[in-house]
Amino acid sequence: MNLLLDTLSNKPIYFGWVVAFALLFGYLKIAPQYNIIDKPNQRSSHTNPTIRGAGIIFPVLYALFVLMFGHPGALVDLIMGLTLLGVVSFYDDVKDVPFGLRLFAQLIAVGLLFNELFVWLWPIWLIVFVGILIIGTINAFNFMDGINGISGIYGFVTAISLYAVKQDIALLGLIAALMAFLFFNLRKKAKCFSGDVGAVSLAFIFSYYILNFSIESKNPIWVLLLAVYGIDAAITIVFRLIRKENILRGHRSHFYQYLANERQIPHVAVSIIYGTTQALFNVLFFYFYFKQQMAPILYAFAGLVIIYLALRITLEGKTLVQQKTT
């Protein structure tokens, strides 16, 4: 709690709020003129046309804080990768971009991230593995961004957690952007969605910090700061493979979508559950990590997996493995 209060009382974050709200108010007026609207379809969890792409403020505020408050020349490769992903993803929010082009942009961006952290010096097999993991994270975040508030709350929890480890002022810009976005998105009828640009940018920024922490500590356990999203994304893929579905196609098979759509639990409530679960896990993570006790963290993660599976099997039953008829 003290960390949260200290973070929110940090002077640069006030500047971030002003810029973020100004950008969002402007975007909400301009976006409809260019038809940057998310229109509901059979996969959607919303029923009203809504402005999308508002997550453009995430990479903008993050990059702005790096340039204004960071060291000269700092994070050049990271910002280049973030800019590339931001441009391609935002264009995808405006007009559909072919999957191959999006994947190509992701590969280049990950390559730039690797350059930032000198990953190219690693063994080839490890470079490939980590690259696949980061691209998987980027696409998982995109699929997980399907109901009001979920990206904003989960992103806020993750950004605060990362800031607890490393007081990087650029994260304050991201936190300010997330809070401003939540003002318009965390409601029954959202004023805007983050869009691909928001989800992809968050995943890329978080991947940088988690990989950085893993390198510095020589411990990959930091990836569990994304445990809740990781569990839902990975297990949903497994069930989709069992049902012989194309896992690259859009869908609404995630557990959060089931809760919001089939169980009719309010979007905001589901988003708070996901964010709170990750926040509580992170508290345990930090408590045991800084006591140099890794086993309890892994036990807690295993417990999350078991609870998640138990809930899905209990609530969804055989539909988890039955092929869906069209």
Predicted regions: what they are:
Residues 1-5, 9, 215-326:
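C-terminal membrane-associated helical module and adjoining short loops/tails
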Residues 2-234:
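"…together with the soluble PPM/PP2C metallo-phosphatase catalytic core" -> "…together
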